[in-house]
């Protein structure tokens, strides 16, 4: 056992200052999460309850096994846009009859649960997670279809929702739809393309065209119930497999459907693991407010891995990147964590070798980000930083074991790519409130623009406006700073959620458990050409 020793002093002024700054960021985050929980606001929640209906999260709660966790995904979707935070959809992973399932629930208190561009992105991300991890998919449906004013952004890409449902089914991943209210127009294909369909009596309405559209198109008079009611679909069309008397009955029946799926995880759950030897509360004070100040990622690793036990790989070589083996909730993991921000040639080669080893052993990889990117300068360009950085990115791109990423601090430039950023398909990616991600730091980006403008003016023989330059730099810095914050990026679905650092071990444990529903095998060779 190689237990990490900790040099962290929780009473030190620096630690206390970092902790206070993190708590302030968490308070801001809670306020944004509260907006998602509030849905369409008091008026629409009251109207929904008056109709005798449960809210989206109440439906999920009744569906899940008692006292089991629900890992909500993309809760801040649409943050900073014209749409409601959460994007009128709740998605996440929960346990139903002992089986981990991917659950999506429309929030009908937000514009009737209608889909907007961010709900679409959020639903597609949920489908990707279900497919990659072979999680049964349960849709709790109550939606008026597409939000018509934004149809130009939804209609064409929105077809992927139905494509995904058929692909899940074709891959042997069960899909279940429980219809609580309207599921009209395009929304009618959700139950139409699910393996199992449950509808609530006198509430579920599933049709391609409602009475007004039918009247306009054919001249036929009809009503909701005869056109698409639950009883009609249960008795006549055969679209409903199960007929429920009310919402709790529908959710009870959904649980019975899942119990009968004969769906098994590819791997047995590991035995109960020993918790870390250090207090997770101390994670709040590790990341400095100024991300240019380095911190030791071993202090983080010591507070998230089983028994704080970590076997480091190449500890004396490429020391800006910490690599090594550990277990997390009993699951073996290989960890890559940035130690001093910048990645040099040595770190890149070390990472490529470590990723290959993890693939040889079929061990998932955890990337802990705090990087400003790859080193620049004459010495490093001549030393081959491009080909060595490319080697690391090649290894990450072609690795076949599951990857998990957590942005703790900076995640800038190609360093974000090398550390398995969103474009590299990690199974899950979460951010701490202290994280920042952009093409480069705000000061660097503003400075580069300033230098280019100054050189351009000199080449034309024009005087340079220093006052205007200072104003431009300030404006660019402010813009890049605001666009690199975790809530902004989470709103755009560039992560799966912004989490409290103290929850990191729990969140990663839930992710690793979900990952082990599907069988995986590392790449044996099969990496692109490494430039040596």
Which functions belong to the PLM regions below?
Residues 1-532:
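Ligand-binding clefts of soluble mixed alpha/beta catalytic domains
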């Amino acid at each position: 056992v190689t237990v990490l020793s900790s040099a962290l002093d929780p009473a030190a002024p620096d630690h206390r200052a970092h902790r206070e700054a993190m708590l302030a960021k968490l308070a801001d985050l809670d306020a944004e999460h509260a907006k998602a929980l509030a849905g369409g606001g008091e008026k629409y929640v009251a109207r929904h309850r008056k109709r005798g209906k449960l809210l989206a999260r109440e439906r999920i709660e009744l569906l899940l096994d008692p006292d089991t966790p629900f890992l909500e995904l993309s809760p801040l979707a649409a943050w900073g846009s014209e749409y409601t935070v959460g994007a009128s959809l709740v998605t996440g992973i929960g346990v139903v009859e002992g089986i981990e399932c991917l659950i999506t629930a429309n929030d009908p208190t937000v514009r009737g649960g209608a889909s907007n561009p961010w709900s679409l992105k959020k639903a597609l991300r949920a489908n990707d997670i279900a497919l990659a991890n072979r999680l049964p998919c349960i849709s709790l449906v109550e939606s008026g279809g597409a939000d018509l004013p934004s149809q130009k952004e939804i209609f064409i890409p929105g077809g992927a929702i139905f494509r995904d449902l058929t692909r899940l089914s074709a891959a042997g991943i069960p899909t279940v739809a429980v219809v609580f209210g309207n599921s009209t127009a395009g929304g009618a294909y959700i139950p139409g393309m699910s393996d199992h369909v449950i509808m609530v009596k006198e509430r579920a309405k599933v049709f391609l065209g409602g009475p007004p559209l039918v009247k306009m198109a054919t001249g036929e008079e009809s009503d909701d119930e005869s056109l698409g009611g639950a009883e009609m679909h249960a008795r006549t069309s055969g679209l409903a497999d199960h007929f429920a008397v009310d919402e709790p009955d529908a959710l009870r029946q959904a649980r019975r459907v899942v119990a009968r799926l004969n769906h098994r995880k590819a791997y047995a759950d590991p035995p109960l693991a020993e918790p870390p030897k250090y207090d997770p509360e101390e994670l709040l004070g590790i990341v400095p407010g100024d991300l240019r100040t380095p911190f030791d990622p071993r202090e983080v690793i010591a507070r998230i891995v089983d028994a704080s036990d970590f076997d480091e790989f190449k500890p004396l070589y490429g020391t800006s990147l910490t690599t090594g083996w550990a277990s997390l909730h009993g699951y073996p993991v290989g960890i890559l964590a940035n130690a001093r921000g910048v990645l040099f040639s040595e770190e890149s080669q070390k990472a490529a070798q470590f990723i290959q080893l993890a693939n040889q052993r079929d061990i998932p990889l955890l990337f802990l980000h705090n990087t400003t990117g790859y080193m620049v300068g004459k010495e490093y360009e001549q030393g081959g930083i491009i080909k060595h950085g490319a080697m690391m990115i090649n290894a990450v791109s072609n690795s076949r074991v599951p990857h998990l990423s957590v942005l703790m601090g900076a995640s800038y430039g190609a360093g974000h790519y090398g550390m398995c950023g969103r474009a590299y398909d990690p199974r899950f990616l979460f951010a701490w409130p202290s994280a920042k991600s952009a093409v480069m730091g705000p000061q660097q980006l503003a400075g580069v623009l300033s230098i280019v403008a100054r050189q351009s003016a000199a080449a034309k023989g024009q005087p340079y406006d220093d006052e205007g330059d200072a104003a431009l730099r300030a404006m660019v810095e402010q813009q890049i700073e605001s666009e690199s914050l975790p809530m902004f990026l989470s709103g755009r679905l560039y992560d799966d959620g912004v989490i409290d650092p103290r929850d990191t071990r729990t969140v990663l444990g839930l992710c690793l458990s979900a990952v082990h529903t599907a069988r995986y095998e590392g790449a044996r060779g099969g990496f692109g050409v490494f430039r040596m």
